[in-house]
Amino acid sequence: MSAKSRILVLNGPNINLLGLREPGHYGHQTLPQIVDTLTQQAQTAGIELEHLQSNREYELIEAIHAAHGNVDFIIINPAAFTHTSVALRDALLGVAIPFIEVHLSNVHAREPFRHHSYLSDKALGVICGLGAQGYEFALSAAIARLQAK
């Protein structure tokens, strides 16, 4: 693994409201707190971490496109786009960067429309229902994959 390894963390719509929005489902941690924890974890491993949260699908797609040749791994919480976005799926397939899908809540224990993901069958792995800690597990897995190269 080179010291230049980079991981991109993408968060979809309404994740900017963490700590306020439905804490019973999503917890009390804010997005900046989660990103700070991940940044420290990545720095300890000698990995550069980038983060983007957007409520706009096209901004997430553009970030995925820009990652091609610049990022070694993606961790994505597509949020509501999980269940609707063929475009995000196509972008991830187009750049062929390995990715892990993360969800704070257990989407399979919620409304039926949340049970389908357009990304899960293409992800290296899916972590759901573990709250903010799910991001840490995803980052640990990504780092392990990069270190194994």
UniProtKB/Swiss-Prot annotation:
Keyword terms: Amino-acid biosynthesis, Aromatic amino acid biosynthesis, Lyase
Record's signal peptide: none
Classification via Gene3D superfamilies: Dehydroquinase, class II
EC number per UniProt: 4.2.1.10
Keyword Amino-acid biosynthesis: yes
One example of a Gene Ontology biological process annotation: aromatic amino acid family biosynthetic process
Similarity section: Belongs to the type-II 3-dehydroquinase family.
General function of this protein: Catalyzes a trans-dehydration via an enolate intermediate.
Name the UniProt record assigns to this protein: 3-dehydroquinate dehydratase
Species for this entry: Vibrio vulnificus (strain YJ016)
Lineage of the organism: Bacteria, Pseudomonadati, Pseudomonadota, Gammaproteobacteria, Vibrionales
